[in-house]
Amino acid sequence: MGFPKVERLLINYKTLDEFKKFKGCGAQELSMLEELQANIIENDSESPFYGIYYGGSLIARMSLYMKRNGGEPFEITGTYLELYKLEVLPNFQKQGFGEMLVNYAKGLQFPIKTIARIHSAGFWDKLNFQPVSVPDGDFYVWHPETNLNTVTNEESA
């Protein structure tokens, strides 16, 4: 068995069965089951769901949506990602799987907006997300860093 990796989840009945394992683990606000059922198309690879399989079973998941700021009162301008419903099964928590999912999203090099759920503020702080407060509620934002050490045409490597 190789090292687990983040992959886009297919929208199909197998994924639906895997999502049922998460139903009792978290709060209702983390449930993706109804969202998946509403969008089920056999083997649709354009799903917003991403996860990590370990030993053939889904152990961690999140949903990731591409958005564009249309004047909302927060510090992201242009295209960004909304990361929702990050959840790791209890037996696999505190082993880096949640961080793997977030790092996958960071690797897309867009700003990320998320809402800290269920006492997870420390997790987002550890991953360099910044808290933002607006009249509609609080959330966390991460911005990709610009590489200040990039070699230009005029410099030598």
Curated annotation (Swiss-Prot):
Alphabetical list of CDD domains matching this protein: NAT_SF
Domain N-acetyltransferase: 9-146
EC number: 2.3.1.-
Keyword vocabulary terms for this entry: Acyltransferase, Transferase
GO MF annotations, alphabetized: acyltransferase activity, transferring groups other than amino-acyl groups
Pfam families: Acetyltransf_1
NCBIfam families: PRK13688.1
Name of this chain's protein: Uncharacterized N-acetyltransferase BCE33L3680
